[in-house]
Curated annotation (Swiss-Prot):
Designated name of the protein: GTPase Der
Species of the source: Geobacter metallireducens (strain ATCC 53774 / DSM 7210 / GS-15)
A GO BP annotation: ribosome biogenesis
Keyword Repeat applies: yes
Family statement: Belongs to the TRAFAC class TrmE-Era-EngA-EngB-Septin-like GTPase superfamily. EngA (Der) GTPase family.
Binding annotation for GTP 1: 9-16, 56-60, 119-122
Domain named KH-like: residues: 352-436
Disulfide bonds: none
PROSITE patterns: G_ENGA
A matching Pfam family: KH_dom-like
Lineage, top ranks: Bacteria, Pseudomonadati, Thermodesulfobacteriota, Desulfuromonadia, Geobacterales
EngA-type G domain: residues covered: 3-167, 176-351
Length: 439
């Protein structure tokens, strides 16, 4: 695994600004509201030709009666335990605080490289005020401005030099990316924590607790996965605050990054219009999909309950009729193992390649059994087929009239391919391409 670098500090000292600066894009949400970053946020970064995983954390506050603040503190402590190198960020404008002193004392006992950094140092006056931090007696003190990129490269050059040498690099092709999406408060974070076996994401009954997309690398059955827990996708009318708008965009980007999308549905509420919108995003992006119906244990059930729920999903999501459905309880752990079993099975289909000879045999049989409808009075002829890609499996079918193939016939061919080659759980893409008779 690549080495890990954790950025920790009090709320609103600029951790996410530094994180975004190093990542090179808006990955963590930045806002003046303290506590905006609540979970640990992971991203792969390369600096000075050295790849490493950067961790952004929620604010590290003194012990508080507020449960959410306590959880954020616990997340920061976990990040420090995971990390190979720690960047402790302080606020040059706010000055030295008792919280800073408390954390510094704790970090003195950590047996790993720690970089003490004063952020928001933008001018000579503030530089002088940052002198208060030298009273901590911590030796080397770095002053930077993450917002204006002052001193950041010098800091990171030293951080990279302190990284343990990694013998292996993260192979993107070897990792299955799983996005966990759904409306707020359907149990996404609880499901993630149950899958991982520990509290990786802050789970709280308040809707919208997870604001950023949170990435976690883990292994299951000797295979590697990247689990992306997204902020809940709300209705457009409810995303008036800029913070919520960023979260929705981040959720949609997470779907784009994923191979497999877990669409979480609240069993207590059934399928909603917003569930359909979320599933539509995943379908349009060409992702393998699995419906995960959570809180199944809370329903009063009879012999027909399961069948009715399956029928509702199949009816509302006709375009995702190929997607498997798993009924779970993230809270109790009921049938949680089925989720990763389905992910593994679906990913195998999503990555599958079919031999050209087998593909053309099935293609020819399908065309012979049911000819394509005429187009403008002309017969649509097909010549041969080839698979040109995976994730999703993509096929090019050569024909004399690529624009004349009716969508219903495309669906017919897709169903034949799915049936013949067991593409359960995976979308398929068909491209009709013209071919001159002389070719």
């Amino acid at each position: 695994m690549m080495p890990l670098v954790a950025i920790v500090g009090r709320p609103n000292v600029g951790k996410s600004t530094l994180f975004n600066r190093l990542v090179g894009r808006r990955k963590a949400i930045v806002d003046d509201m303290p506590g905006v970053t609540r979970d640990r946020n992971y991203e792969t970064v390369t600096r000075f030709e050295a790849p490493f995983i950067l961790i952004d954390t929620g604010g590290f506050e003194p012990v508080s009666e507020d449960r959410l603040l306590q959880q954020m503190r616990e997340q920061s402590q976990l990040a420090m335990e995971e990390a190979d190198v720690i960047i402790f960020l302080m606020d040059g404008r706010a000055g030295l605080t008792p919280s800073d002193v408390e954390v510094v004392e704790m970090l003195r006992r950590v047996k790993k490289p720690v970089f003490f950094v004063v952020n928001k140092v933008d001018g000579e006056k503030i530089e002088n005020e940052a002198a208060d931090f030298y009273t901590l007696g911590i030796g080397t003190l770095h002053t930077i401005s993450a917002e204006h990129n002052r001193g950041v490269n010098d800091l990171m050059e030293e951080v990279v030099a302190a990284l343990p040498k990694s013998s292996t690099r993260l192979d993107d092709e070897d990792i299955t990316r799983i996005a966990v999406v759904g409306r707020p408060n359907v149990g996404k974070s609880s499901l993630v924590n149950r899958l991982l076996g520990f509290e990786r994401v802050v789970a709280n009954p308040t809707p919208g607790t997870t604001r950023d997309s949170v990435d976690t690398l883990f292994a299951c059955n000797k295979k590697r996965y990247l689990l992306i827990d997204t902020a809940g996708i709300r209705r457009k009318g409810k995303t008036t605050q800029k913070l919520e708008k960023y979260s929705v965009v981040d959720s949609l980007r997470s779907i784009e990054r994923a191979d497999v999308v877990l669409i979480i549905i609240n069993a207590e509420e059934g399928v909603t219009e917003q569930d359909e919108r979320i599933a539509g995003y995943a379908f349009e992006a060409g992702k393998a999909c699995i419906f995960v119906v959570n809180k199944w244990d809370t329903l009063a059930k009879d012999n027909s309950t399961l069948g009715k729920f399956v029928d509702q999903i199949k009816t509302e999501f006709k375009y995702l009729s190929f997607a498997p459905i798993v009924f779970v309880s993230a809270k109790s752990g009921q049938r949680i193992n089925r989720v990763m079993e389905e992910v593994e099975r679906v990913m195998a289909q999503y990555s599958k390649r079919v031999s050209t000879s087998d593909l053309n045999r099935v293609f020819s049989e399908a065309v012979e059994k049911h000819h394509a409808p005429l187009s403008h009075g002309r017969r649509v002829k097909f010549y041969f087929a080839t698979q040109v890609g995976t994730k999703p499996p993509t096929f090019v079918l050569f024909t004399n009239q690529p624009e004349g193939v009716h969508f219903s016939y495309e669906r017919y061919l897709m169903n034949k391919f799915r049936e013949a080659f067991d593409f359960t759980g995976s979308p398929l893409k068909i491209i009709f391409r013209g071919r001159d008779r002389r070719e």
